[in-house]
Amino acid sequence: VSASTLNDAFTKISETMGDDFKRRVLNDDGTPRSLINIYINGKNAKFSSGLDTKLSDGDEVYILPAVAGGSHDTGEGVSDLSEKELDRYSRQIMLEEIGYQGQLKLKQAKVCVVGVGGLGNPIVTRLAAMGVGNIRIVDRDVIELSNLHRQTMFNEEDVGQVKVETAAKKLRKLNPNVVIEELPVSINDYTAVDVVDGCDVVVDALDSVDARYALNKACIEKKIPFVTGAAVGVTGQSFTILPNESACYHCLFPALDEDS
């Protein structure tokens, strides 16, 4: 639309979009509802001049309502984002690949991350920061001094503590809205199925080939997407296994052992 100010833009958009837009976004006096976040070129309008903010040719205006509507509801018990969540995740909601509905899916998701070491540390931190609703972290190890140069979630005061217990405390501080489950268990053929049960995605950040085979087998049995990654020195690999759609980990690497 062609508009000189944000207020002018709202007036013209409401005329074009009709009653549904007005009901969701505007108060009776035509001003934006309190649960609406407005961004102009990535900057929150509330920190500018509000509705009097001047617009230029090419400006991009994002209107993010805090209430989802009708068929856009993404799952049980999660139908909207709070005003605080909209503000917190605003920079990623603006991405076309995520958007409002994508953020709802993240809030609804349950992700299991197995291994909270060199790979798992940044993975669980990013998942919690971006608003994944439920994260299950699995690792039986304790924190060692030699971990600290790459496992930056931990510090010297944490040495000797169980990794998942310490990680869970720090993740809850990072994002109190995320549910963190910690399991200080080993992964093997007897435990893997129970570990992944009920999760939407499993992320493998293990340092054991035998444990990875067991995790792969459990994900295939439960039909859970399995993201696996490994690093040796300065090289690494990462790929996603989709049960019944792609090759599994054992299909790709049928004869690995801990030594090789």
Q: What do the PLM-derived regions correspond to, one by one?
A:
Residues 1-73:
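Ubiquitin-like/PB1-type beta-grasp interaction modules and other compact soluble beta-rich domains
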